[in-house]
Amino acid sequence: MKLGVMTALFGSRSLEDMLKHCKASGLDAVEICAGNYPGMPHAKIPELVKSADAAKKFKATVEKAGLEISALSCHGNPLHPDAAIAKEHHANHRNAVELAKMIGVDVVINFSGCPGDSDTAKHPNWVTCPWPDDFSKIRDWQWEKKVIPYWKQEAKFAADRGIRLAFEMHPGFCVYNTETMLRLRESCGDNIGANFDPSHLFWQGMDPLVSLRALKGAIFHVHAKDCRIDTQNTLKNGTLDAKPYGDVVNRSWVSCTVGYGHGEQFWRDFVSELRVLGYDGVISIEHEDGLMSVDEGFGKAVAFLKNIILTEKPAAMWWA
């Protein structure tokens, strides 16, 4: 396994400075932001797609720093009911897939997106319950008319270029748990899989280790981010919490640096399960911790994971 980082947290640094800092911190890889919600802080993706020389130079810059690119990330909502937003997010997704092919990266990360409740909707509508029946009808319409047709088309577009699409199971979007991830994969193709981020699963009451096992063969990329559950607030209000992330004292849960939500034993079990299932790729740190600075959160995550990830190939079992 290798250790990397999702580079959004270093958006204020230049590409060269960011790469230098990542290498000096002991990382092996970077996950490059390719538009939509993460932005494009280190590379103007549309410009790179238009120029093979520019794309080659970008890749060479990363490699010269002693790093590799684990994935291109364009987390967005190409199914947004606002046509302008959907068009922009779709274009950024397509550009990320094209650039990935050009620079020899085989994973592009996204969200599944979430449509509205009809073709006349203005805002996404994330369904969390089956009744009244309106909600079941909305969910069925979203999947049958929007989610599956769109991603079946995009899965083919990516497959034709040798690219795998890794979806982050994230509340607010149609793929948010194990069964919705599997439904998308089964409906659209084997190059559809997961960017596995356990933080979004904890507060839903899921066991990430059980989810990992169910997704064997469909884990394309991994995020290292934790989630701290506030027991008092959860017992009072439950976990469907729409308060601002900055309202830490009142929220039922918050994202946090690895080790600050779940201890070493969970993360040791997590990387062990990944290896059992055949994943030996990059573990990419994602910093979203409202209680720490970028540098402190990143530094603590690197130190924590360095002692946990498995970096060497397992030895032959001479005892078996």
Q: Where are the language model's segments positioned?
A:
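C-terminal helical cap(s) of enzyme catalytic domains, especially alpha/beta-barrels
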Residues: 294-317
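Acidic/histidine-rich catalytic cores of soluble enzymes
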Residues: 2, 29-30, 36, 72, ...
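Conserved, mostly hydrophobic/aromatic
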Residues: 5, 22, 30, 62, ...
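A structural motif
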Residues: 27, 67, 100, 105, ...
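Active-site acidic/histidine proton-transfer and metal-coordination neighborhood
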Residues: 16-17, 21, 56-64, 68, ...
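A short, acidic, flexible beta-alpha connecting loop/helix-capping segment that sits on the rim
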Residues: 10, 284-293
